[in-house]
């Protein structure tokens, strides 16, 4: 179930990086401007300012063991998917003895991993021109898992695995097909492969990009 990402108190935020200072001073006023200038997200508060009202969902919880001098210590490992359901998405992981703390760490990690997702109408069966799907086929890999995401006609829906469906929904993609290879039962690698594929939507320069640059 989607939950709203808790934001930090921006008034009390003291930036630790030059990019954070630019954001707090209003010299960078949108997340799009940040990515257009090829600047990294160096503090989670940057996302709180530039991309408010994000939502997240916990998609995987594991209990992992760590060997110490005192013996094995059990901790929770949490994987979350985060996005604004309108072109920005992220994933994050967190580990802690308490589940609540692990989720908080995963949310913080996800804020640092926000990426823009290029949307479009790339299916030859659809000519609506609306950003309901992907503009072209993209491929992502993580571990042994490979995910191919393909554009689909409007109204098709998300014909993908359940976890991948969550990822695409948070990215704002409504119609898509997918093919997968490898050990897709490993939830984290499956999600990371899908995230990698979405990241690759901006590795290609389209005709529209050339027109905008001119």
Swiss-Prot record:
Name used for this protein in its record: Small ribosomal subunit protein uS5
One Pfam family hit: Ribosomal_S5_C
Coiled-coil positions: none
UniProt xrefs under HAMAP family: Ribosomal_uS5_A
GO cellular component, one term: cytosolic small ribosomal subunit
Organism: Saccharolobus solfataricus (strain ATCC 35092 / DSM 1617 / JCM 11322 / P2) (Sulfolobus solfataricus)
GO aspect biological process, one term: translation
Keywords, alphabetical: Ribonucleoprotein, Ribosomal protein, RNA-binding, rRNA-binding
S5 DRBM domain: residues covered: 54-117
């Amino acid at each position: 179930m989607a939950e709203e990402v808790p934001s930090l108190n921006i008034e009390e935020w003291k930036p630790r990086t030059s990019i954070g200072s630019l954001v707090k001073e209003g010299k960078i006023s949108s997340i799009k401007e940040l990515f257009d200038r090829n600047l990294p997200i160096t503090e989670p508060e940057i996302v709180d300012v530039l991309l408010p009202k994000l939502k997240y969902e916990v998609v995987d919880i594991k209990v992992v063991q760590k060997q110490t001098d005192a013996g094995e210590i059990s901790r929770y490992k949490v994987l979350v998917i985060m996005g604004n359901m309108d072109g920005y998405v992220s994933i994050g992981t967190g580990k802690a003895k308490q589940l609540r703390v692990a989720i908080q760490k995963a949310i913080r990690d996800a804020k640092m991993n926000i990426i823009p997702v290029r949307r479009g109408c790339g299916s030859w069966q659809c000519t609506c021109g609306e950003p309901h799907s992907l503009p072209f086929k993209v491929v992502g890999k993580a571990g042994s898992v490979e995910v191919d995401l393909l554009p689909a006609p409007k109204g098709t829906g998300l014909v993908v695995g359940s976890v991948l469906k969550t990822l695409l929904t948070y990215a704002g993609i409504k119609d898509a097909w997918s093919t997968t290879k490898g050990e897709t039962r490993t939830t984290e690698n499956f999600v990371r492969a899908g995230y990698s594929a979405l990241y690759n939507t901006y590795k290609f320069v389209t005709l529209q990009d050339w027109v905008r640059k001119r």
